[in-house]
Amino acid sequence: MEENSKFDKKSLKTVTGKTANFGELAKDCVAFANANGGVISIGIEDDSSLPESTQVISETLPEKIVKRINELTFNVAIRPEVITAENGGQYICLHVFPSKVSIASTTKGQYLIRDHDASRVLLPDELSRLISDRPSYNWETKVSLNIHWTKADEQKLHN
């Protein structure tokens, strides 16, 4: 399957060994969450459609991925699933859910979006538009510190 706005492929090296780069995976998860969600197949190389036939995913790897993505992102929801391909090789199908109410970001403050087959940083005007398009939290209905307005300082109410 070709990479597009809903699908991406990552090498298993992205999440294992000395070459693991969870930061890049986190950026892709943020980009998918800010778009309409998507799927990242981890363990399938860019030039392949199947994993290596001998590839086996360890039982702890999906949990490790969830833990690291949760540490590196805000407002990103993911669900990993280990899939056995036709050739017997295994890979992880990482479902990234769309962030419908809030804006997803990395813990470094990067806001990204999926654009065709790539993830890119949002420009300020795009971020403003994305924020205004999302239904926001209704702060007016939030009770702050459980203090009723009748206990407010009357002098401050009249100024």
What are these regions (language model features)?
Residues M1-N159:
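Conserved N-terminal catalytic/coupling substructures associated with nucleotide/phosphate chemistry
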